[in-house]
Amino acid sequence: MPYLQKPAKQKNRQINREDRRKIYDTSQWRKLRSAYLQQHPLCQLCQQEGKIVPAVDIHHIISFMSTNDHLKRLALAYNPDNLMSLCKECHQKVHNQP
C-alpha cells in the first residue's frame, strides 16, 4: 500500500498553527488581550478615519511568527507596543493585504 505524504506546505501550516496556539492558549495572552481591549476598546484603524467602531480583535503589528527564535517570538507576542485593537472587518483587511 503506498504511503501518502502530506505536502510540505500543509505540514508547515499545521506546525505554524500549533506554534500560534502555544501563545494564544496561555493565560498570559488572555490577560494581556483582555487588558489591551479594556484600554483600547475602539478599532484603532477606524478611529484614524474618524469612525467609532468597537474593537473585538487584537492584531500583532509584527507577527510573532515572523521569527524562529523562541525568545524573540515571545517578546513580539507579549509586547503591548506590538498590538493594535481592531474590528473584525479591519483585522481581515490587514491580513488580506498583499
Give the location of each predicted region.
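Short N-terminal micro-motifs specific to bacterial/archaeal maturation
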Residues: 20, 34, 74-77
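Short cysteine-rich loop/turn motifs with clustered Cys
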Residues: 28-65, 89
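A boundary/linker detector
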Residues: 1-31, 47-54
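Intrinsic structural disorder/low-complexity segments
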Residues: 13, 62-63, 94, 98
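Short linker/helix segments within small regulatory modules
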Residues: 65-82
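Generic N-terminal initiation segments characterized by hydrophobic and/or small/turn-forming residues
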Residues: 1, 34, 80-83
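Short Cys/His-centered divalent metal-binding micro-motifs
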Residues: 50-51, 80-98
